[in-house]
Amino acid sequence: MAGDRPRLVTDTGFTYDLDGAEGFEQTVGRVLRQTFLLDCVTRTEGYYQVDLHERRRVESRLDVDFAALYDRPLADRLETYLGVSFETVADAIPDWPLTVDVDPTVESLDAIPFVANDLAVVRTTPDPDPRPVKQTPEVITDFLGAETDEPVTTEFVTPDPVSFDTIGHAWVGDSPPIDANKLTVESLRRSLDVDPDESPIRIHVVCNDTAMRDEQVVSEYYQLNDRHQFDISMHTELSVAEFRELLAESADFLHYIGHVDDDGIVCPDGHLDTTTLADVNVKAFLLNACNSHEQGMGLVEAGSLGGIITLFDIADSIATRAGLHFARLLAAGHTLRTSVHVLRNHVLAGARWMTVGNGGLSLCHSRSGNPLYLRLLDTDDETAHTEIQTFVTPSHGLGSVLNFHIDSDTRYLVSGELDTFDLSPSELDDVLDGDTIPVDYENDRYWSDEISAADLL
């Protein structure tokens, strides 16, 4: 509908101004998040009623008859939702799974249907010009093993911070971003052609650096998810021709351990430059090597759907530790993007990993449907004060609910921090036994299949 100001208009005549005090993009983002929350609350009515935690939080604040609203047309529901002050319900809105910054060009427009389908909050970038970013000296010193006064400088786009709690941050545009998933339209399109099947998940683990062979144990970590069958092959010191041939074969995932330099992926007999490849049939990948962004983009442009790469030089010890955690996170059902999110707090500051292509891909399903993440905030002999977070996946997106059987039948909307719980030792063990979960306590990272409440309390 033509007009001087952006607005939302329903077929019943209701009009809502989208050019609010916070500006158009901020207002649209608020409308999306507020409408989502309140419609989820309304949908707890009907034939299959749900005891929803978020309804308990907001119902007493609102003068809304949700039982009556359930039977009303969507336009009437929307008018009711937007009659509520955003601040009244803001603290009950789930952490948003994805915010996408879009370079406002014609080429970027084709990405909009995909990010809208993910219910992402979309922003345009007024100044997307890449700027120099310096790698922290500590990382370079660790990598080189000597002091240096010359930090490495690379040009990246630095998206503006998001003003609300968001888990994933993505960028659509030409230049590489800092701390965001570089989406590409072609990788999103190719993802539509992927049909799930019952065949084993095929993974190639390639180690082209004998000094990093400790990371080869990842082959065991990928198989910890007993809901799936895995076909894992190990490869060491692949030649350029052998590596090129491997990438041409159909596979679900490549975990590369080794080195990348300006000429490409380092092989015993030279370099494999992925930007020269015409056909890659590995769906997703982890290039756990120094400054692997360009080679990762080469894989995506040649056919991969998405992957995890590094932006700077990474010390071998840090890369090995990160590779082991990535394998566990992906096997636990995390997407490429949420794997990076969960890992970021547990590597040296400045050593940055990011995703390229479709960062919303997952390798397999979590036992819980949505992968979990636990933070033990405080403990004593009888109680663990625990924060539980969860994340959306391609199969269990926004609107999914979880029940922990901790407090009867209460369910929680998935995405981000759900709540804090005071758990007894037996309740904590029940949570730890239910799935493979990363657990953070006193600045250390544990895994639920390696510990019990007795180790923590």
Sequence positions of predicted segments:
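Long terminal accessory regions outside catalytic cores
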Residues: 1-118
